[in-house]
Amino acid sequence: MYEVGRAGDFVSRQMWRHRARGSLYAAGAATAALTAVGALLGALLLDGGALRVSAAVAGVAAAAGCGYAWIRATRSLGQARRSSVGARSEREVRTAVRRTESVAAAYGLVLGSRGGDCDTVVFTRGCGAAAIEVKTGHGRVSAENGTMRVGNRVLHGDPARQAANQARRLSRKLGGRTVLAVVCVPGMRNRPFTTAAGVWVCSARDLQTVLDRAPRVFGAAEEARETMRSLWQAAPA
């Protein structure tokens, strides 16, 4: 199978940015905490009234700064953990794609100036085309009125619409040919289903069954591979 891109590359970069930011905030919180302790001790030990007041004010300000930095550090490190899980899900889908005997696959392919990249584009073994959005979760998946749930958790945004939009963009790149829109939740435990808009929702285990439904849009495997190569080379850096 011809492959381009790196599965989970975008969210991995996000993870490292969040980790770096979280580490800086954590270091700032530690520095502010030490400053606060020193200033408050000074307020207790100093003899001059004005100096004691100044030290106390500085200590309170440093303590407030410590609290703010700690909150930001916790938030950034939480975002880093979520990005790490998202990258892992995209790699799970890549593994599933490699088992489907597909002709070509691209990971993180940018299909337009808006809407971000498509997690995975696949040209199937039947010479069909699919745009896959990857979401994270384990349990029963349901979708209704623009909301998708995995177990009791509501996924952010509208994953089915995201997949449909990416499929539409890919279709335009392919001259209006039909593209299957898919949301893949690797840990989904129920059977594949379609939303009211015709977007397929499936687990990594059932991905091949769903991809086999993509109608043929290429005359031969070599045409599909060359098309993927051209799409990747033409995509914005």
Give each language-model segment a name.
Residues 1-116, 123-129, 140, 150-237:
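Surface-exposed interaction regions that form or flank ligand-binding interfaces
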Residues 131-147:
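Active-site ExK catalytic segment of metal-dependent nucleases
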